[in-house]
Amino acid sequence: MNLFVTDQCPVKSAHALDDKRVGKLLMECNQMMSLAIKVHDPFGDWECGPTLLTAGQPHINHPVSIWVRENISNFEWCLSHALELFAEFVLRFDKEHASGHRIPYIASKRSCLPSGELLPFQNSARNAGIGVDYSHLPVPVSYREYLRERWETDKMPVRWTNR
């Protein structure tokens, strides 16, 4: 569960992701935003389903999930990022990612989030399994370095189709 904040701007951050991660991160954004709604409005008028909220409460205590639900500004950053990830997926693959169809419903339920200014991004740019930890660096730099390192270990060559 992560956002891979390679830039303070959610649009630029989405553009920086390689093909492999565009769809994956779109699904993760939707999971974290769905979780934020469920936590702040546990008895609300919402539903789970293919074009609705995601099911369950995965990664409820992950630091990035907590950051997304901390306030409306953090949630809005994630929402903007998800919208751009969906657009990126269409641009790169000439088809829609099914997870993108959740976004309008998720956006319609965001009023339950508390107000607040955008908080510093959660830095989770580490993976003990492969011995990578850039969490000591400033957030955008840490994620760019983390991804560079991950790309070197990927089995398939990294691609940015139509970019």
Predicted stretch roles:
Residues 1-97:
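An N-terminal structural lobe/cap that precedes and organizes the functional/catalytic core
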Residues 109-163:
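Aromatic-residue-lined binding/catalytic grooves and analogous aromatic/hydrophobic interfacial grooves
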Residues 1, 59, 72, 86, ...:
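Generic intrinsically disordered, low-complexity segments enriched for polar/acidic and small residues
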Residues 101-108:
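A glycine-rich phosphate-binding loop feature that marks nucleotide/adenosyl-phosphate handling sites
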